[in-house]
């Protein structure tokens, strides 16, 4: 029909709060591997601890080819998380203000703990993670420099309330505007 008869306009934005990977995100600490992040958007950092996270984005390889990443949304996928202390070990942490319970620099994403089987190398867990990523996606650690990866809550949208009159989902308030 012609525009003169009217139109419906729908608009959305997708700048939902998230954890973006830094350019050199992969590191090992205490025999566990992590991605170092920085947060985007107005987040309550304490809400990001121990929830399942999915990874989304794209990695540009050195040869210019790209790899789309979507890990954690399918039921068979692994998920990731920001670690937090158990309550009985967190006495000092619990003295912090709400905005500092989890500090920005503590929002590192746990990505693995299994070491590479070679006694002659250091950072065995980091090496094992890179071996997995290279085998599955054909990427090297240098490829992270040109990657745009983000971690988001790995929860499905659900009805809220006995009457199912509301929805609860990551970013729905941003994506519907």
Report each predicted region and the residues it spans:
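N-terminal hydrophobic/helix-forming segments and targeting peptides
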Residues: 1-177
